[in-house]
A protein has these predicted regions:
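Sigma70-family region 2
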Residues: 21-22, 46-49, 58-75, 94-97
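DNA-recognition helix of helix-turn-helix
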Residues: 85, 89, 136, 157-181
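Arg/Lys-rich amphipathic alpha helix in sigma70-family domain 2
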Residues: 68-72, 82-103, 117-118
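Structural recognition of an alpha-helix C-terminal capping motif at a helix-to-coil junction
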Residues: 54-61, 74-86
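Helix-turn-helix DNA-binding module
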Residues: 130, 134-138, 146-163
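Short, charged helix-capping/linker segments at alpha-helix termini
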Residues: 3-7, 21-29, 40-58, 161
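Amphipathic, Lys/Arg- and hydrophobic-enriched alpha-helical face
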Residues: 32-50, 66, 129, 174
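Acidic, proline/glycine-rich intrinsically disordered inter-domain spacer in sigma factors
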Residues: 3-4, 99, 105-130
Length: 182
């Protein structure tokens, strides 16, 4: 699927990537403007809203630093998306959340309050995702939103494939409960 920046003339985006890799800040700014909304949306779904802005900036700092490593084997947006997912995963691991949220202890997930905070507040899909426990949210976003397979998620997060499947099942149940107002 082509992203907005790649629907331009291919040479324009390729040119910006090449120029930015050579240190051209204006070209990097164009790349940033083309891709920031999608990357921020991804970080918002995988992390808390409060962390999304900071992590999005971290992703683009890392992009600037690693742009010289982009070989063009895939679309720039694919490379950037993968870099973003890696930064988010690294961020979560650095806070030692990984062990707690990926434990096989279902009691940790059962402690989630699934009802809306206020009955009169309209619950939408994004807020339902935010209500998921961090591990379930991450797997839900990677699988159902971003389209990764369980085996790919297992490798990315260093978990068992079965853990990914259980977390996704639990996330879907919690989403249903949250969206139905139960």
């Amino acid at each position: 699927m082509a992203l907005s920046g790649e629907t331009q003339a291919g040479s324009g985006l390729d040119s910006d990537v090449a120029l930015a890799a050579g240190g051209d800040q204006s070209a990097f700014e164009r790349l940033y403007r083309t891709h920031v909304a999608r990357i921020h949306s991804l970080t918002r779904r995988m992390l808390s809203t409060q962390e999304a802005d900071e992590v999005t900036q971290d992703i683009f700092v890392r992009t600037w630093q690693k742009l010289g490593q982009f070989r063009g084997d895939s679309a720039f947006s694919t490379w950037l998306h993968r870099l973003a997912v890696n930064v988010v995963i690294e961020r979560r691991r650095s806070f030692a959340i990984q062990r707690e949220r990926m434990s096989d202890d279902p009691a940790a997930l059962d402690s989630l309050t699934v009802g809306p905070a206020r009955a009169d507040l309209k619950v939408d899909f994004e807020s339902a995702i935010e209500q998921l426990p961090p591990g379930a949210r991450e797997i839900f976003v990677l699988h159902d939103v971003e389209g990764y397979k369980h085996r790919e998620i297992a490798v990315m997060l260093d978990i068992a494939t079965g853990t990914s499947k259980r977390q996704l099942h639990r996330a879907r149940m919690l989403m249903r409960q949250h969206l139905s107002g139960e």
